[in-house]
Amino acid sequence: MNEKIAILSAYSFVNIEEPANLIPKLLLIGKRKYVRGTILLANEGFNGSFSGSYENVNLVLEELIKLTGPKDVNVKINYSDVHPFQKLKVRLKKEIVAMNVDDLNVDLFKGEYIEPKDWDEFITKQDVIVIDTRNDYEVEVGTFKSAINPNTKTFKQFPAWVQQNQELLKGKKIAMVCTGGIRCEKSTSLLKSIGYDEVYHLKGGILQYLEDTQNKNNLWQGECFVFDDRRAVTDDLSPVERHWLQR
């Protein structure tokens, strides 16, 4: 029986002084361990998704943590019969998730986590609004029943949507959701920076929610778009091979 391929996703908002210096080291260990995927590095932290054997993806993660020294790392592991990535890439970026807002310190200034097991109860409260921070083409594939779709084509458009919808957000508890946690975490930092106090986000994102809850209350509708060769997954995290999505 063939060993399942582990798909490890990890991110952390942590100050990295010279991220370019880490690229050769990560490429070296990743290629030695036959790991494929993408790791993004920036001064604000790292964001990676890569596949290989369970042992090897964890060795690459250990090296990434050793080189960057974060206090907290958000880690998610799924499994597949095949590699969802073609090769290993380590890239230097201005931001690990591009919002185009300067001087956000997400490491120190962000909203509160809501655990997946508590999410359904929280978002059905009358004073809570749910915002799906993903792009429109992702939301069309699947989202939460009550979620607001900002209809953005890129995450860089999200700050403008917030500015244009302050009356909608006023006086509400704001719950943010995204695929794996990184965009909603950065979104909470944006809202906190402009004066919103009660800001929350789904810990681990949609993928962790589906794994932990199996969508038992049917608040999630549709499938979840993912940024690899699987294209989308069902609420039991099985690949949806029919997906055609164009970005």
UniProtKB/Swiss-Prot annotation:
The keyword Hydrolase does not apply. It comes from the Bacteria. One of its GO terms (biological process) is tRNA modification. The active site is at 178 (cysteine persulfide intermediate). Signal peptide: none annotated. PANTHER family: RHODANESE-LIKE DOMAIN-CONTAINING PROTEIN 7-RELATED, THIOSULFATE SULFURTRANSFERASE/RHODANESE-LIKE DOMAIN-CONTAINING PROTEIN 2. Disulfide bonds: none annotated. Catalyzes oxygen-dependent 5-hydroxyuridine (ho5U) modification at position 34 in tRNAs. Belongs to the TrhO family. It comes from Rickettsia massiliae (strain Mtu5). NCBIfam families: PRK01415.1. This is tRNA uridine(34) hydroxylase. One of its GO terms (molecular function) is oxidoreductase activity, acting on paired donors, with incorporation or reduction of molecular oxygen. Its EC number is 1.14.-.-. InterPro entries: Rhodanese-like_dom, Rhodanese-like_dom_sf, TrhO, TRHO_N. It catalyses: uridine(34) in tRNA + AH2 + O2 = 5-hydroxyuridine(34) in tRNA + A + H2O. Residues 124-218 form the Rhodanese domain. The gene is trhO. PROSITE patterns: RHODANESE_3. Keywords: Oxidoreductase, tRNA processing.
